[in-house]
A protein has these predicted regions:
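Conserved alpha/beta cores of soluble small-molecule-handling proteins
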Residues: 31-203, 207-210, 233, 246-317
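Leucine-biased recognition of intrinsically disordered, low-complexity hydrophobic segments
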Residues: 8-10, 28-32
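Glycine- and Gly-Pro-enriched alpha-helical subdomains that act as flexible
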Residues: 210-232
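Short, contiguous acidic and Ser/Thr-rich linear segments
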Residues: 236-239
């Protein structure tokens, strides 16, 4: 529970107002109220009443997975893919959470009970292996996983999506299972913090001379009219937005190559953009100090942005 100095006093309780506009990929303002209702181990509870064991392996080892999905004023975008990815991450970490199929219904209930139906919102779910005496080996017998989920409303700032962003390049110091949506994100946060402190909006990783992805985004390039992105592998997260961008691009007849781009080919890049659940499609106009194209969002990027937005509007009905 934050102290009075850390938050706003509301009816004797405390809330936190967080503005990430100085460094977020797509600047957004969110409001986390500790009087909101969250999901915890099968129950809906006020956030302030939730307690987690200090022996939880998520706390001790970052032994867990997470998923984030976006609510568009009436629906979740491609919830099925988020559900599939969640189950895969759980399998890869050998966490047996019996309620994994409930994620969509839990997410919908959190939106409803927190009265977020008519605005943009996000739902975060985290599942750890559970609480047990500290040991590098898995608990024997198995313990019940710890599941926590909450929702919050936000107002996207479209400036970055319209004007483009500048990003840095950095050697990829993460582990070799980036395909798992693990809560072990310290290399990502350290790298993103460095980008923020340098006035940049994202950190793009380079592994052995190959550009892989961002600290919390996938990245695409346009070279000679062809759309490039790193192929699915253990070095990138299979982004839900990434998958849908590839589908949209194919439908528009854009040439696609799921092929790694070498750092030394940046001089040939005419356009680039990043993608994730919260920032959708955000143009990159400067990469590692190199201005891309004319320094403004390019035609392929804007086409994909437009088609993505039209799809969202169509789903709203």
């Amino acid at each position: 529970m934050p102290t009075q100095e850390a938050g706003l006093k509301l009816s004797g309780k405390y809330a936190i107002f967080v503005d990430y506009s100085h460094c977020a990929i797509a600047p957004l303002t969110l409001y986390l109220n500790y009087m909101e209702t969250a999901y915890f181990n099968g129950k809906l509870l006020p956030r302030e009443n939730i307690t987690i064991s200090p022996d939880d392996r998520g706390f001790l080892f970052a032994d867990g997975v997470y998923e984030v999905t976006r609510w568009y004023e009436g629906f979740f975008y491609d919830m099925n893919s988020h559900q599939t990815r969640l189950k895969r991450s759980l399998r890869e970490l050998r966490i047996n959470w019996s309620d994994a199929d409930l994620f969509p219904s839990v997410a919908n209930e959190l939106i409803k009970i927190n009265k977020l139906e008519n605005q943009h919102a996000m739902v975060y779910l985290q599942v750890t292996r559970g609480a047990s005496r500290r040991s590098h080996s898995f608990p024997k017998p198995e313990v019940t996983p710890t599941a926590y989920s909450y929702a919050w409303g936000f107002t996207p700032d479209t400036k970055a999506m319209e004007s483009g962003i500048k990003v840095m390049l950095k050697e990829d110091i993460r582990w070799s299972r980036c395909d798992i949506k693990s809560i072990a994100l310290l290399p990502n946060t350290l790298s993103f913090q460095e980008a923020c402190e340098n006035g940049l909006k994202e950190c793009i990783f380079v592994r052995n001379g190959v550009i892989t992805e961002g600290s919390h985004s996938n990245i695409f390039f346009v070279i000679d009219g062809t759309l490039y992105t790193h192929p699915e592998s253990n070095h990138i997260l299979s982004g839900v937005t990434r998958k849908n961008i590839l589908r949209i691009a194919e439908g528009e007849g854009i040439r696609i190559r799921e092929e790694a781009v070498q750092e030394n080919r940046i001089r040939f890049v005419k356009e680039a953009f990043i993608s994730n659940t919260s920032s959708e499609v955000t143009p990159v106009i400067e990469l590692g100090g190199n201005t891309l194209g004319d320094g403004v969002p390019g035609p392929v990027t804007k086409m994909i942005q437009n088609k993505f937005n039209l799809e969202i509007k169509a789903l709203k009905g």
